[in-house]
Amino acid sequence: MKRLRNLSSSDSSDNESPSTSFSSCFQHKGKGKCTADDGKKSAEVFRKDLISAMKIPDSQHVNPEEYYQFADTWKQEWEKGVQVPSNPENIPQPSLRVIAEKAKEVLFTRPRKYIHCSSQEPAEPGYINILELAESMCRYDLDDLDLYWLGECNLELADMGCAPVDESTMEKTLEVLERQCHENMNHAIETEEGLGIEYDEDVICDVCRSPDSEEGNDMVFCDRCNICVHQACYGILKVPEGSWLCRTCVLGLHPQCILCPKTGGAMKATRTGTKWAHVSCALWIPEVSIACPERMEPITKVSHIPPSRWALVCSLCKLKTGACIQCSVKSCITAFHVTCAFEHSLEMKTILDEGDEVKFKSYCLKHSKNKHGLISEQEEPHKTHSDNRPTESERTSLRAQKLKELEEDFYTLVKVEDVAAELGLPMLTVDFIYSFWKLKRKSNFNKPLLTPKEDEQNGLVQPKEDSIHTRMRMFMHLRQDLERVRNLCYMVNRREKLKLSHSKMHEEIFNLQVQLVNQEVAAGQPLSNALENTLFYPPPRITLKLKMPKPRTRDCRISSVKAGTMSSPDNQNSSATYHGMGGEVHRQSSEHTKLYSTYASEQRNNGLLGGITRFHKEFQGTGCKPSSRFRSSGKPMSLQAVIHGQSSNGSGKVQHEHVSLARANGVLSSGDRTQRDSSSQTSPGQNSEIICHIAGQSTFRKANMEHFSRSFKEATNNLVRTTEDLRSSEKPQRRQSVKERLWSKQPADTQTSGTPYQDNDGYCPDLELSDSEAESDENKDHMLLRRNSRESPNRDSCRNSRIRGKRKMTSHSSVQR
């Protein structure tokens, strides 16, 4: 027999690998999975007890020094266990053989120096280099004006006896003219040729705004953008021989400063290399710093700038772009950009502290003017205007004027001979095209006909970078969306699995219940529960229990006395039958009544009246004739006799239960009233036949009583209705006497205090019994018969007049007993 073991936390893992615990490892040693070839035992097993022993429950108190805590997430594949050898003899033995080393063959290789390609075609056929093809294509396209002029030019050349010019030749000539003009103009600007401007000694550094220089800290000019910086201010460790270019000019970029709205100047990049900022802006903004002071790059801690500084608006340029600084005067909050302050000649001081710390002081336009006024008052009055050196603004305007003149004389920068030599065209043809190019450009306000190639490349590179970042963000969002979809799919899958397991469980329960019902039907036994309650679950009912006043002591004291004072005319026959029967018949009739009351009370829980039909079917299986026990209504004759007073006193409870069941559901059909009226005329012969049938079915009732556990008292309590409810739905047929009203008032008060009133929803909660529980079964039977008589008064007035005297005698005899 297989040894039982406790389940560990790792046993619940869903894996298909063979596993075993420490206790079953040696017991089932060799029971691993076998190979398909030789059927041998596996040489290894997976032990999960090591994983279980390693785990510590959360509720266990262990010294932190005695265990290690995993910081990473526990993986499900770890639950499969540890692979350990179980059958060492089944471990395959390796086999090998020594192979002699094969001698290497020397193959002939052709030297590369003897391989030459005489053609310019690519080595791979069908391969086309897109970049080379783009370079070979002409960038200029002729428009309608060019085509019209070309036609007129060809007519002139034909008259002169020269070869005509085709469209491609004219496009290439115009492209070469534009390219040479652009290159020569840039060279003139960079080398100051044609500008005729010589820088004087008052030029200042673009970073520190100081015109002084010293040994080892010379001022260096960029040969392209013409900015002037100190070596220490820009981080130039060694001045190169020849030309020098700043960082932006080396890369051929014209970036925008992230700290101010200005472009150009001494700029350095951030760590990413995609954002640029002025060195002066990085020095004057307190949150920003420079990583390497020797090289003055890269610019860091831009993210440390608070949002309040980004939200400041410059008082000089009125722009909210970038980050502004504020006036150093404590009472002044004027904001301005660093570069705007330099342009407006605001006072910007750099103070060296005693601890070799550099402090930056900046003043707004108002406070700078005050300081300038104080300084001008302290200056000597004999200062003359002998110093005629131009200011910085004058130099800037002079430079702009020279550049404008250079743009107007653009045609002087191109030589026709060089263009003709480069293209291999006759001078006359190139001269015609040169004249047309000059006139067309003059008519367009000296603007170039082609965009410079460098600008096109910059324009292509920047959108490409932007598109790359956009695609990266798009893919990131797409991945997040896919992750959300995956989680949703997992949750939906898990929900459907739970629903499937729940449905399978209900199906199994239904099949088992059907199997039990079939077994009971096949064995001829009565059903242990209602079929509709077994197979179909009713919705839950909500019952409101109301607190009623406690019963008075006087009512409880006289409740046993007045129980038998009143009885209906139908009870006379019942009393006579009771005295005429033996004790055995009375006991069997009581069992029969309890059996039926149990069915009726169970059926009331579902708000249905199908229990009577099921009781009828059980009596059909006993083998009696239908003609002797059934009417056209389908009810047993014994039930009709009990309802209308033809049975014993113990059967009188069935009458009350049937009426309470019908009224609790709020339905009392006309068929039931007709059957009750017709059954009241039962002959004495039928009564004797019913008594014999009840005596013969005692064994059947005893077998049925084993299937029910509810007592007679519980069934009675579930079927009792309040007297006030019954009294409200009926009208008395006659005026009672004073004595009868006095006796009938007491049970109504007692029942009202014991049973709370509620709506007729087919459900009645258990009632709290008063002192009447100590009464005998006989008095209870009479009380139920009395209530039934009040609830169902006799409709036959003739019969009521005949047996009125007998009713009084029966009432007095009940009181005496």
UniProtKB/Swiss-Prot annotation:
Keyword Repeat: yes
Basic residues bias locations: 801-810
Pfam families in the record: EPL1, PHD_2, zf-HC5HC2H_2
Annotated segments matching region Disordered: 1-38, 375-396, 665-689, 719-817
Keywords: Metal-binding, Repeat, Zinc, Zinc-finger
Compositional bias segments (type: Polar residues): 667-689, 747-758
One term of GO molecular function: zinc ion binding
Native source species: Xenopus tropicalis (Western clawed frog)
Oligomer status and interactors: Component of the HBO1 complex.
Zn finger (C2HC pre-PHD-type) location: 254-288
Keyword Protease: no
Family: Belongs to the JADE family.
Zinc finger (PHD-type): 202-252, 312-368
Composition-biased stretches (Basic and acidic residues): 379-396, 722-743, 777-799
Name of the molecule in the record: Protein Jade-3
Function text: Scaffold subunit of some HBO1 complexes, which have a histone H4 acetyltransferase activity.
Biased composition, class Low complexity, residue ranges: 8-24
Record CDD domains: ePHD_JADE3 (cd15706), PHD_JADE3 (cd15681)
Signal peptide: none
Domain of life from the UniProt record: Eukaryota
